[in-house]
Structure formats: structure tokens, C-alpha cells
Amino acid sequence: KRQSVQGSSHRPRLAVFKSLKFVYAQVIDDLQGVTLVQANSGEPEILKKLEGGSKSKAAARMVGEALGERAKAKGIDAVVFDRGGYIFHGRVKEVAEGARSKGLDF
């Protein structure tokens, strides 16, 4: 059971996960338990644009931007940011800034 950050259908949760190779982000409605939108740095359209690696800060920013665009297309304007226990720095911060740059409010 989630204790700290809880999303709803009006304001879903934007969760970030970092692996050793990729950065993942998804928007989740915790009341229904479904993922509404997702993006990761392993997607071909993101990998094509990258010059660093799939785990770089530039990749994380592109993941945030892609997620922001997809969320806006689905009518999601505001989210609750769940940094997943990571400090708000580096790749996690870049995902947040990328999503904010596309108009997502949190």
C-alpha cells in the first residue's frame, strides 16, 4: 500500500524509476490502479534523438517532455510528482523539468 504520495483521477501520480540503463516515467491513477501514460529512454523515437546515452540527463529530459506531451493529449493537466525515493537532483529533476516545459502542472 502506498503511504506517502497518492494520485487520483483528477490529479494522477507521475512516478519516476531509474535503472542502470534507462529512465522510466509513468502517470498512474492510484484509485483505479491503472497507468494512464508512460515514457522511457529505451523507446526508439527517443533513442534516435539522443547523442549521449539512454541514461543521460538529456535522455531524462526527453522522457519528461514525451510524457508531458502524451499526458496533455489525454487531457491530464496536473499531476502529483513521486520521485520514488530518489533525491530531486540529476535525472529525476530533468524528468520533472521536461514535463513542466510541456505544460504539466505539479
Regions found by a protein language model. Name each.
Residues 1-106:
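Ribosome large-subunit tunnel/peptidyl-transferase-proximal elements
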